[in-house]
Amino acid sequence: AGACLKHYCCNGNEKYRFVGDSIVSKRALSEIYLRNFEYAVRVGHPYAVMTAYNQVNHVFCSENAYLLKDKLRDEFGFQGLVMTDWGGTHDKVEALQNGLNLEMPGCTVHNVRIVKEAVEQGNLKEEELNEAILPMLEVAKWTEKKEKVGERNRFHRCHARDPGIAFL
């Protein structure tokens, strides 16, 4: 199991969360709004980051190359997958090009067609699509079962038993 950080970033206005646009300087963004995400990525190594619905400086979070590539991936060193909140994608092709890996709640036939047509028309490079897919494969590898469940349960029973004996 792994953690998913949300909602990346500047998600502070629930009333206008789907249409809001947080206009913020790069300095304030780094010093105030991104600092906790950076710490969580560097220390906690989450499996996923979920984008917020809102825009930051006129670009939706799910399509924001500055937030997803420059800051999250390049500066913070995030290696997991970036996903939208439910219905949080506005331009599927732009989102894939700018750092999104997974659209929630899932991929419909309509969305597959949009991506396929973008590749066929040269609007989305195959390399960009591969780059979007690789983090999902990495997370899948991280979650592979490494031990038998029974062995893990026996380990936990032993460790739970020992402190319990002290209270008897």
Give the ranges of each region predicted by the language model:
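Glycoside hydrolase catalytic-domain context in secreted enzymes
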Residues: 1-168
